UniProtKB/Swiss-Prot annotation:
InterPro entries: Antimicrobial_8. It comes from the Eukaryota. This is Uperin-4.1. GO terms for biological process: defense response to bacterium. It is found in: Secreted. It holds the Pfam family Antimicrobial_8. Keywords: Amidation, Amphibian defense peptide, Antibiotic, Antimicrobial, Secreted. GO terms for cellular component: extracellular region. Shows a medium antibacterial activity against L.mesenteriodes. Transmembrane segments: none annotated. Expressed by the skin dorsal glands.
Amino acid sequence: GVGSFIHKVVSAIKNVA
């Protein structure tokens, strides 16, 4: 769902940051 997509994006950003 949308929540899963957002969580994936946030996870990627946190991984890079």
